[in-house]
């Protein structure tokens, strides 16, 4: 029997893959995004940049910006009945519209 892998990126072939035309790093404006405290943001993982990447199970979730630490933003998400706090690089965040 082979041991089961429990790595960070397991079972993410579809979630963390890019189409060939979208390969490489995103534009610099995505790295330099600014968010306000209290602003709602969506977690959309950028697979080509690994720093400040949240766990893939939170891809697509919406949270609230609570503060900033270094280049990363402190984002709170409700998971079930629990409030969880993440330090996420802005390249993995998109502002909520509307």
Swiss-Prot record:
Coiled-coil ranges (or none): none
Which ranges are annotated Basic residues under compositional bias?
1-24
Stored InterPro entries: Ribosomal_eL21 (IPR001147), Ribosomal_eL21_arc (IPR022856), Ribosomal_eL21_CS (IPR018259), Ribosomal_eL21_sf (IPR036948), Translation_prot_SH3-like_sf (IPR008991)
Keywords, ordered alphabetically: Ribonucleoprotein, Ribosomal protein
Q: Name one GO cellular component term.
A: cytosolic large ribosomal subunit
Q: Where are the transmembrane segments?
A: none
One Pfam short name:
Ribosomal_L21e
On assembly, the entry states:
Part of the 50S ribosomal subunit.
Tell me the protein family, please: Belongs to the eukaryotic ribosomal protein eL21 family.
What's the protein called, per UniProt?
Large ribosomal subunit protein eL21
Organism for this UniProt entry: Thermococcus kodakarensis (strain ATCC BAA-918 / JCM 12380 / KOD1) (Pyrococcus kodakaraensis (strain KOD1))
Species classification: Archaea, Methanobacteriati, Methanobacteriota, Thermococci, Thermococcales
